[in-house]
UniProtKB/Swiss-Prot annotation:
PANTHER family: ASPARTOACYLASE, SUCCINYLGLUTAMATE DESUCCINYLASE. It comes from Burkholderia cenocepacia (strain ATCC BAA-245 / DSM 16553 / LMG 16656 / NCTC 13227 / J2315 / CF5610). This is Succinylglutamate desuccinylase. GO terms for molecular function: hydrolase activity, acting on ester bonds; succinylglutamate desuccinylase activity; zinc ion binding. Transforms N(2)-succinylglutamate into succinate and glutamate.
Amino acid sequence: MPAAALLDDFLAFTLAGDAPAEQDGACAGGAVRWQWLGDGLLAFEPAAADAAARASVLVSAGVHGDETAPIELLSMLVRDLAAGALPLACRLLVVLGNVPAMRAGERYLDDDLNRLFSGRHAQVPASREAPRAAQLEAAAAAFFAAAPAGSARWHIDMHTAIRASVFEQFALLPHTGTPPTRAMIEWLGDARIAAVLLHTAKGNTYSHFTAEHCGALACTLELGKVRPFGQNDLARFAPADRAVRKLVSGGRAEVDAGGGHPSLPRVFTVIDQITKQSDALELFVAADVANFTAFARGTVLAQDGDYRYTVTHDEERIVFPNPTVKPGLRAGLLVIDTTRETIAALV
């Protein structure tokens, strides 16, 4: 297939499973160089020779194959960069994550790809997701290894959620052992993200891998509900899309009508999780309970044999409740509001 088809509609090209006739070249009237690195992997770099000041930005979507809206947004980002409609001010790696699951219209084929990073894919060698996790790790590591010394590194991993949420759009920051940066929290505010969830333990997500192993300012964005390709109201994603485009193009954060910057998001910290011990797990919440629903002290939320989870703080909120996960995996997170102390500690 010609390279123009790749750049004009990255999503359709990737779903078709073709390799481009040319795997690198120039676009945007010669202002941008591009390189196809494999299925769903596309790198861009400005042609101008001012590399020392450039940030390196990885933007990903489709780590879950049925989370279509961010995939569509990324395809439009590629189109606009290639056409010169959006300037490029950074090194950029665009990633469509679980391409076979995207083609099948499924979240994943064998295993949740976003639980297989930081080497965990080696524990499930028969999984169809395992080679892709290893490939995405290698691509990210190579991309950030080539970053100019001392330059900014970002990873924005865009998702949509299975269920409704008290905060429709929220972010998750991986645990790195240090407080979140002001740059990230302010960028999330500019993206109109209402809430941020801080992990307190290491994980196996894509954003955790890039934060820990590549030194990136990384986040997972949850931007709304899962819908099939072509059925998304992309206007609902406009603030996040604008923020990503500004990050890529070197634009400035928005200023509101009063001359100030957008409000910072509320911050919640993970204080525990419900782990599925067996198929006997019972979650005592409604099947359609929204993410960030609050529960009072003393509420029993789960039972699995001798295991029971009871709320011990004045208020805890549940995020990602899912009793259908495989035994050994997380069936829900419990978080508390830590906005004041987190904002005070920003660096």
